[in-house]
Amino acid sequence: MSSSRQALLSLLAHKSFKLGEFKLSSGGRSDYYIDCRTTTLDAKGARLTGEVFAEEIRQRGWKAKAIGGLTLGADPIVAAVSVVTGELNGFLVRKAEKQHGTGQRIEGFHEKGASVVIVDDVCTTGASTIQAIEAAREFGFNMVGAMCLVEREEAKGRPAVEKAAVPASFVSIFTASEVRAEHILQTDDTQPVIFAVAATCEICGNPAVTNVPRNRCAAHRV
């Protein structure tokens, strides 16, 4: 796992993952909630998000001119990747066409026939990702890939998105299990404090107070 990817996972576990009883936008209930926007709209989190998504796109060999997704979850991801790459344009997909002005549903990049990547923050049922895929294709984009930041591994979301994406592929940066495991590591008070050399927190860069399991400052140890 790259350093940017590990740092992004740590930030998601610290800022975005919560245990408890929650009602999801899908209507279901869950014993945990992941609000990715607290990470993707964080100054450092935005940079890491852009780096990790850009790295994944390069590794997949997806040749795209733009990146976009359904508002609101995709918005900060789109902006982050566009800024980090300096070459991928961004577009946003409205949940419905505007009832005024141009009445368009796609905002931003507007080149019909262009190759694009669809992104989302969390995939549960996959409904928002599928809406973006369908809107992008209806507009005239050529979708070469679809991505989400965290896949919840439930509600048959992944198979649904994979089916909608064909012939393109769908990938997730992290699974909810990975984020949960990292969160549990961060909140485990039984972890010992072991230092051989001076270190800084991998999340914020401040002096670390522990390096087990990873370098953390006092604020990010729990």
Task: Outline where the language-model segments fall.
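PRPP-dependent phosphoribosyltransferase catalytic core
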Residues: 2-11, 134-198
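Phosphate/pyrophosphate-binding loops at sites that engage ATP/ADP/AMP, CoA/4′-phosphopantetheine
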Residues: 53-64, 133, 137-138
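Short cysteine-rich clusters marking metal-coordination/redox-active sites
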Residues: 201-204, 217
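Active-site-facing substrate-recognition patch
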Residues: 1-60
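Short, glycine/charge-rich flexible loops or terminal/linker lids adjacent to PRPP-binding catalytic cores
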Residues: 78-117, 125-131
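Short glycine-rich phosphate-binding loop at a beta-alpha junction
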Residues: 62-73, 147-148
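Cysteine-rich micro-motifs
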Residues: 211-222
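Conserved acidic residues
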Residues: 65, 114, 144
